[in-house]
């Protein structure tokens, strides 16, 4: 596996978490999600986002409503369900545990590469 494939796999693993976090702030239009992800340097295309949103809705974690737009057709705005909020809280706890574990491993590896000793 080359680095590009590894990066894609890592991003796929956190994309659902990021999407739920963005939606947790309130009603969000899909285009705004794409903009926020892009500004965070997470490149996602509509062909990836919309199937993910459908899967999250089918899981019961989000819902949507149609809102009339003065500049075109109605827009679909996404919002977390109560079940989605609970799921996001659990994902966030898992994220912090995982990030802490990864940081511990990286820190130990750096210590060892500098000639230090590993503390288990």
What are these regions (language model features)?
Residues 52, 71, 103:
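Positions that flank functional sites
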Residues 60:
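Glycine-centered, phosphate/nucleic-acid-interacting loop/turn motifs that mediate DNA/RNA or nucleotide
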Residues 63-69:
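Short E/K-rich amphipathic alpha-helical oligomerization segments
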Residues 86-120:
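Amphipathic alpha-helical dimerization/coiled-coil segments
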